[in-house]
Amino acid sequence: MDSKRAALESGDGPDAKRLDTTDDQDKEASGGDGSQVMLAKHVAPYTGHGCTPPMESYLFEPTPAGSQLLPWKTSVDLDNDAELEKPTSDKKPDTAKLSRRELAKMRREHTLRALALERELTNKPGQTPASEVLLVRFPDPEITAPMLAGLSKDIRDVVLPISVAPRYCLVHLKAGADVEATICDINRVRFGTGHLRAELKPFSDEEQAEFIDPCSLYVGNIPFNMTTSAIKAYFANAMRVDIGVLKREKRARYAFVRYASPDQTMEAFKELVDSPLNSRTLTVRYRRLRKRAGMPMVQCATSFQALQSPNGDDDNTDCKVISPPPLESIIISDSDNCSDSSGNGKEDGKRKKKINEQEREIEKLKRQMAEYGAIIKSLQFRQNSLEDTFIPDLTPKVEPSVNPTGCLLGSNAVHLMRDIKKECDYLGIPDPVPATKPTTQAQDDSQKKAKRSCFGRLFTGPFRRGTSAMKTADEYEKDDRLEELYAQLERDPDP
């Protein structure tokens, strides 16, 4: 209770704040803000046991009998609530919560406003009007499904593409051309089995505004010597700036400038129209969206087929056959339950992506194995070819001999060698052994033997001298005998 009294005396309590608002309505102030309490209107209630009523009882007015209790609200509070509700009602609707129809309607309004602003600021009184457009139709014969179905009785259905429609084209005339005279000249031209037909093609404002982007501007005639950073700095309030170079005129640049909202785009359009930039006047207009020419679509049209009617007497009764609807892709789920597989589209997409990655890795490994196999085969082929080229010649070769009979040719050399061998056997002369160069290993062995038999050389010295003398005498005798035989062979005539 004391805290409430202190709050009321200081003017910080809730009751004091509410009573502060009543001062604007010329009402009497309450005791919470330091003013006097009027006891004539604030009567203390009866306590019943002689206690002094609290000070809070003087702050409330007595409620008359039969009145209805209402919540604590003053007229000022009601006014404040109304003011709080006003900005919420004046707020623009959120585009994310709008339907497609409302969004299309809003975009149509923005494009019409942009087209009107462009016409107002770009079309001047002395400027030539825009060129007229003519629609020229070609005299192509009309092709229908019943006509094609009547070509043969075996035709069940006819599917017509869009390309069978009669052809036409749009022709833009020069500025100031005579439209009526041009139409008459075109209509007199013979084409195929008929004549061309030309007519004026009027474009409504909605048709022209359909291709306008209300948030993007086309800015042309930008100086070529300006850098990209300088051009982007010139459009400081833009969200995005795409810069390009004209194909025909290489001395000028253009830019597509995009803003956050259509209103900002209109303000920028007003500022940029006919504004100078480095001694050049900018060309500004709203960006046009082009419709991309897609692939020729096949249009499933209704066809008429001649069928036999079992209930009718006429055999040529025409029956209208409606072609089936176009097929759509069906996703088959592997789960046991018969639930719709559209909910698991993300999981299926991830699974397919993993399978595709695994297949790619397998194909990559296969390609690497094939490359390695080709390299191994090429190396084997090279090795075989090198072996064929470097095979040693195993045929015996005749080495030069000291024997002069080795120079003889033919069968005489064979007979002479036989005779020499017989004479050697008869005389007891052994076959000559070719002198070989002793190896290092033999030298080592002889050194070892010499080390082992160093003490025996003292006792075997005279004997070794006699044997060496005998060997030299025998060798001399053999050489003399061979010389005699060679001389005899030279003297004997050939048999």
UniProtKB/Swiss-Prot annotation:
GO MF, one annotated term: mRNA binding
Region (Disordered): 1-51, 332-358, 432-451, 461-495
Matches recorded under Gene3D superfamilies: 3.30.70.330
A GO BP entry: positive regulation of gene expression
Keyword entries, A-Z: Chromosome, Nucleus, RNA-binding
Amino acid composition bias (Low complexity), ranges on this chain: 332-342
RRM domain span: 215-289
Name of one Pfam family that matches: RRM_1
Ranges of compositional bias, category Basic and acidic residues: 345-358, 472-495
Keyword RNA-binding assigned: yes
Biological role stated in the UniProt entry: Probable RNA-binding protein that specifically binds to the fourth chromosome and may bind an RNA that spreads the fourth chromosome. May be a reminiscence of X chromosome dosage compensation of ancestral Drosophila species in which the X and the fourth chromosomes are one single chromosome.
Protein name, entry field: Protein painting of fourth
Species the sequence originates in: Drosophila melanogaster
